[in-house]
């Protein structure tokens, strides 16, 4: 994932079209729809539709972890000069079994909490802080901004909402 792409190849998301004032509403709406997909799936949300595709619960846990990580990146970039974020090791978390105890009900609550914390951070960000620079993670060399991280949070939620909706379609046949 480049730090400043024009559009996501997978979902068509355009980072430049996310205004910081619109981001909280878009994030909240995507997460609400995400949780609805999780609730509709029930225990079937624990099942992978194929070995190479995550389950709905795994996607939900990934989004939870990504939002928590982005919140920390925003806070650190607000208080230090050009910090470098830590990768979240998304694939490794799954491969090492860190999601195996997640249940649909618990991961839904955890996603709601993570979203609420990030939304509070977005809504209380001091004026002028959207342009503060940071290195998104050690996997990237170019600086980006807090505004981009906020847009990326929206992208994560909207993109993976598409993934869980597809899982639902695959489950229903």
Q: Model features per residue range: what roles?
A:
Residues 1-29:
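Terminal targeting/low-complexity segments that flank the catalytic cores of oxidoreductases
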Residues 26-31, 35-40, 93-133:
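Acidic/histidine-rich alpha-helical segments that form the ligand environment
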Residues 20-22, 80, 121-122:
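A broad, low-specificity signal for short, low-complexity segments enriched in glycine/proline
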Residues 1-5, 43-94, 130-173:
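Short, contiguous alpha-helical
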Residues 7-12, 22-23, 37-39, 82, ...:
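Short acidic/polar alpha-helix capping motifs at helix-coil junctions
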Residues 24-27, 56, 104-111, 146, ...:
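Hydrophobic packing residues in well-ordered alpha-helices of helical domains and bundles
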Residues 15-19, 92-107, 139-147:
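Acidic/His metal-coordination segments adjacent to aromatic residues that form catalytic metal sites
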Residues 20, 27, 52-56, 63, ...:
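Hydrophobic alpha-helical segments and helix-packing faces
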